[in-house]
């Protein structure tokens, strides 16, 4: 429906987003779900998450500008990055559900968000054959589901706010940093070959490489 070049753009966009979004995730949930003594209220995790999401988006802009991509490719990559950033925001709420031993709520929210986002993406691609418009629709659906299924439910359980105690937020940042660095480097290693193909061979080759690479990655 899209052709080799645009499909390759989407493929490398997903790889870049999966790599850079480790900054947004920052292993915050790992610490959040084990904070059984509630050392940090939800607002601290939420504030740190939003800060890391902003850094992720800025990093994605720097990356695409540094690589000199075409305007269309820049737009595709940034839209995919935004989708993954929205995922990381939802992860904050789902981490709170998990900490309260309601992993079922996390699972339902994640299922609905991913299912309907992909469904909208596929349907709009088939109908419009416009990748950028389809990605915008996917992001809108993901945002609406986060607001309706994550934020609205979490609002009845915790206080959703941005805290001003940046000193404690920085302490939380330092706690999460070692695991975050490990995850960032691991994801870079996984995606480094695809990033090299993108730099050396172009979008069409990226599509074919992904078709070969994906089964091997899943098996490993």
Task: Name what the model sees in each region.
Residues 6-35, 84-90, 183-192, 210-220:
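Small-residue-rich midsections of specific transmembrane alpha-helices
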Residues 1-21, 73-74, 171-175, 179, ...:
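Interfacial/gating helices of multi-pass transporter permease domains
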Residues 28-40, 85-112, 132:
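Membrane-interface junctions at transmembrane-helix termini in multi-pass inner-membrane proteins
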Residues 74-81, 108-155, 175, 208, ...:
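Hydrophobic alpha-helical transmembrane segments
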Residues 13, 18-65, 75-78:
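Membrane-water interface segments that mark the loop-to-transmembrane alpha-helix transition
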Residues 14, 19-23, 59-62, 69-93, ...:
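Alpha-helical transmembrane segments of multi-pass membrane proteins
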Residues 29-32, 92-99, 103, 123-126, ...:
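C-terminal transmembrane helix end/exit motif
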Residues 104-109, 131-133, 147-191, 199:
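Interhelical loop/hinge segments that connect adjacent transmembrane helices in multipass membrane
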């Amino acid at each position: 429906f899209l052709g080799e070049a645009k499909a390759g753009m989407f493929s490398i966009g997903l790889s870049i987003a999966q790599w850079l979004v480790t900054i947004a995730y920052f292993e915050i949930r790992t610490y959040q779900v084990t904070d059984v003594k509630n050392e940090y209220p939800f607002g601290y995790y939420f504030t740190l998450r939003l800060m890391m999401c902003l850094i992720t988006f800025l990093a994605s802009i720097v990356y695409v500008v540094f690589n000199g991509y075409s305007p269309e490719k820049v737009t595709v990559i940034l839209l995919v990055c935004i989708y993954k950033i929205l995922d990381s925001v939802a992860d904050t709420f789902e981490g709170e559900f998990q900490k309260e031993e309601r992993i079922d709520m996390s699972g339902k929210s994640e299922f609905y968000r991913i299912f309907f986002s992909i469904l909208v993406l596929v349907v709009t691609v088939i109908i419009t054959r416009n990748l950028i418009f389809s990605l915008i629709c996917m992001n809108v659906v993901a945002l609406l589901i986060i607001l309706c299924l994550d934020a609205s439910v979490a609002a009845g359980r915790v206080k959703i706010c941005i805290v001003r105690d940046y000193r404690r937020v920085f302490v939380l940042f330092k706690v999460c940093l070692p695991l975050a660095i490990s995850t960032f480097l691991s994801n870079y290693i996984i995606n480094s070959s695809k990033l090299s193909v993108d730099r050396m061979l172009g979008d069409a080759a990226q599509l074919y490489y992904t078709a070969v690479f994906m089964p091997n990655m899943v098996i490993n």
